[in-house]
């Protein structure tokens, strides 16, 4: 292999690749608590980057360095740690397993070319991990399965393997079997024992012969089925012994193609299986040159020819994560897809979310284009940044103080700006209303939210113009908790969560007349305005109409707009429960004026009073927003989801089959019933369901629900 790595032992100096052939970008995914972060510690020790592993419980791991991660003892963000093994640089991308932080997981998948699905021997496979496997299958991403926590009191390797095969398919086959303090290689038929950080080789015990032969036969048949040599299976079934080197070669090709998925058992606490896993990562997983690049466009949206993953190609890189630190400033984690990044050069920064996603994120991620100068380059080892002289195609690096770059932005040559189509961002669907605890902190809150939005595309910030609330749209309660925690600890802003107000509206159920009289004459210049109006309801979406039918100049011409202004002001305030009035026609019929005391203000007040009197004379109904939702749910949970939708006053529009034993349910549900649906649906379907929502229309709220709202308003 031409591209090799300049490697130094220890954490101070980073391994440096000469080209993309010497790089492997590997993302670790799987359930929360499966041992991904601890596995990275063990791999760093095996590669002699660390002398001893850190501990999640003690808050000393390389990848869980954020204050929230240390406190919660779980990953909440993406982190990268690199090592060198057998002349190859391996970038290990640690991702959270908890569903609230799926945005970090998506970024990790974008940064990597292959994936390790990490499953704990005492837990098995959860539904979100099954769904993620299917997504990786659709794009042909190479994968391997790692079964961890072999030393756990409730560990059962055989059950975990069966669960993985049931979930992921029959091409998931073990390369090794756990045995005491080591592993048995099924192709080599050797026992690899670990002691004091060293691996020794010896012959397995005779008692293991039967299970070795059974597993070895299944493995060999699985490899041969994926072989490009069609005669190999016939020769094998005919009794020919296939050379181990041939099997290994075919195995590596099948793994790189994403058609065969080896299983490696690992015990992170003892190091068992770490060297075997590194061998799979460096020999079986493909380099970035074999992984297709994302779609490329010009800033004007014109498709561009695909670039090669080559050091000498035009620069094309992407910001996969952004962090802000009070001391070091903004740091951008960047995956280089083509070209080479060097310090003290100017690159073009492009952000075009709305061009690809219809403006859905433009309020917090506006489109932008500007040139910026590259400052310090480094290779990350968790939060530690190790200096880099240059970063080649296929590698991952950190760039300090790119002031305008946000997560998802593209870096390219300023002479030929390009834009990578961003990866699909999951839509945040849990609304949390907040307010600064102290009014003096409102400016700091605004700054902090702006910076967090630049870092996290799954955080949407809404300034609701109807309810006048600041609403954080998050992925779940844990995500919201991390956001609020960061605001407090990083930006010094104490934030209160307040009751979320759904933007209801009011309208008239029937015709009504109202008399407005605003007269104050107690000496000096007084106030005098009287008007009579009629209010009629209009069809939904008609808005507001104002008609003038005054005869004989009862209301002077210059004060007719004043009456309309007063009516509009009262409509904004509401006439019954404090919500805006919509879809009415107001006709000015009559009125009275005074030659001295009448004024614009007096007739505004009269118009407002007339509308309120008309409202008291008829029935005013509340209108609530209705959303159309689409729920993707495993077939096993369809009944539970349908029952829950019914309890939320939902109307099911239909169901359809989505494949992979899943169903899509379409329904219309009042927004007020959806405020916690992101949390409740996860509980109903064990984290395996997802949904989207879009506004449909306003419609009358049932009396029982409206009564509760009116009681609260009172």
UniProtKB/Swiss-Prot annotation:
Family matches, as Pfam families: EFG_C (PF00679), EFG_III (PF14492), EFG_IV (PF03764), GTP_EFTU (PF00009), GTP_EFTU_D2 (PF03144)
Residue positions binding GTP: 30-37, 94-98, 148-151
One GO MF term attached to the UniProt entry: GTP binding
Biological process terms in GO annotation: ribosome disassembly
GTP-binding listed as a keyword: yes
Region feature (G4): 148-151
Transmembrane parts of this sequence: none
Start and end residues of each tr-type G domain: 21-289
UniProt-annotated stretches for the region G3: 94-97
CDD domains found in the cross-reference section: EFG_III, EFG_mtEFG1_IV, EFG_mtEFG_C
Protein name: Elongation factor G-like protein
Organism classification: Bacteria, Bacillati, Actinomycetota, Actinomycetes, Mycobacteriales
């Amino acid at each position: 292999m031409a591209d090799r790595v300049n490697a130094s032992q220890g954490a101070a100096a980073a391994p440096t690749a000469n080209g993309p052939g010497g790089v492997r970008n590997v993302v670790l995914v799987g359930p929360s608590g499966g041992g991904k972060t601890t596995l990275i510690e063990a791999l760093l020790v095996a590669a002699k980057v660390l002398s001893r592993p850190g501990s999640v419980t003690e808050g000393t791991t390389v990848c869980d360095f954020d204050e929230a991660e240390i406190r919660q003892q779980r990953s909440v963000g993406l982190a990268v740690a690199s090592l060198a093994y057998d002349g190859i640089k391996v970038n290990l991308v640690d991702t959270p397993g908890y569903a609230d932080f799926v945005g970090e997981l998506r970024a990790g998948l974008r940064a990597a070319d292959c994936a390790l699905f990490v499953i704990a021997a005492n837990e098995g496979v959860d539904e979100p991990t099954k769904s993620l496997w299917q997504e990786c299958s659709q794009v042909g991403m190479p994968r391997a399965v790692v079964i961890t926590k072999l030393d756990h009191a409730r560990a059962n390797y055989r059950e975990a393997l069966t669960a993985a095969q049931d979930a992921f398919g029959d091409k998931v086959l073990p390369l090794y079997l756990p045995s005491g303090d080591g592993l048995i290689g099924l192709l080599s038929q050797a026992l690899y024992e670990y002691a004091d950080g060293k691996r020794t080789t010896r012959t397995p015990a005779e008692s293991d012969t039967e299970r070795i032969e059974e597993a070895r036969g299944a493995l060999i048949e699985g490899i041969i089925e994926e072989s490009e040599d069609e005669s190999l299976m016939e020769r094998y079934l005919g009794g020919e012994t296939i050379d181990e080197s041939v099997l290994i070669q075919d195995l590596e090709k099948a793994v790189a193609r994403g058609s065969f998925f080896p299983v490696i058992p690992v015990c992170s606490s003892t190091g068992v299986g770490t060297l075997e896993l590194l061998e799979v990562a460096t020999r079986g997983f493909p380099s970035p040159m074999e992984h297709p690049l994302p779609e490329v466009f010009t800033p004007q949206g014109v498709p561009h020819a695909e670039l090669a993953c080559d050091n000498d190609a035009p620069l094309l890189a992407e910001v996969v994560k952004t962090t802000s630190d009070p001391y070091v400033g903004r740091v951008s984690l960047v995956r280089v897809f083509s070209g080479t990044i060097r310090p003290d050069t100017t690159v073009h920064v492009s952000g075009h979310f709305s061009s690809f996603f219809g403006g859905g994120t433009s309020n917090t991620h506006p489109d932008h284009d500007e040139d910026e100068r590259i400052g310090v380059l480094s290779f990350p080892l968790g939060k530690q940044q190790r200096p880099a002289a240059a970063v080649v195609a296929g590698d991952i690096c950190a760039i300090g103080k790119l002031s305008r770059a946000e997560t998802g932005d593209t870096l390219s040559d300023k002479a030929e700006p390009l834009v990578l189509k961003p990866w699909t961002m999951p839509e945040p669907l849990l609304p949390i209303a907040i307010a600064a605890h102290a009014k003096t902190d409102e400016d700091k809150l605004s700054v902090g939210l702006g910076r967090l939005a630049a870092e996290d595309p799954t955080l949407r910030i809404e300034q609701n113009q109807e309810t006048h609330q600041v609403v954080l749209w998050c992925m779940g309660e844990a995500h919201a908790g991390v956001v609020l925690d960061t605001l407090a600890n990083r930006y010094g802003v104490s934030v209160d969560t307040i009751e979320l107000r759904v933007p209801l509206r009011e309208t008239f159920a029937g015709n009504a007349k109202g008399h407005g009289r605003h007269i104050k004459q107690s000496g000096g210049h007084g106030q005098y305005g009287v008007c009579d109006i009629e209010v009629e309801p209009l069809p939904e979406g008609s808005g507001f109409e104002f008609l003038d039918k005054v005869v004989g100049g009862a209301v002077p011409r210059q004060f007719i707009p004043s009456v309309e202004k007063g009516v509009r002001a009262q409509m904004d305030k509401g006439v019954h429960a404090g919500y805006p009035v919509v879809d009415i026609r107001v006709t000015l019929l009559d009125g009275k004026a005074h030659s001295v005391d009448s004024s614009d203000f007096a007739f505004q007040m009269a118009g407002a009073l007339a509308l309120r009197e008309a409202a008291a004379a008829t029935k005013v109904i509340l209108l609530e927003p209705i959303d159309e939702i689409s729920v993707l749910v495993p077939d096993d949970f369809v009944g539970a989801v349908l029952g829950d939708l019914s309890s939320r006053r939902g109307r099911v529009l239909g169901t359809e089959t989505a494949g992979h034993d899943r169903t899509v349910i379409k329904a219309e549900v009042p927004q007020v019933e959806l405020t916690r649906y992101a949390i409740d649906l996860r509980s109903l379907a064990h984290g395996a369901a997802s949904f989207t929502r879009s506004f449909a229309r306003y419609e009358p709220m049932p009396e029982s629900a409206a009564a509760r709202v009116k009681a609260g308003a009172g």
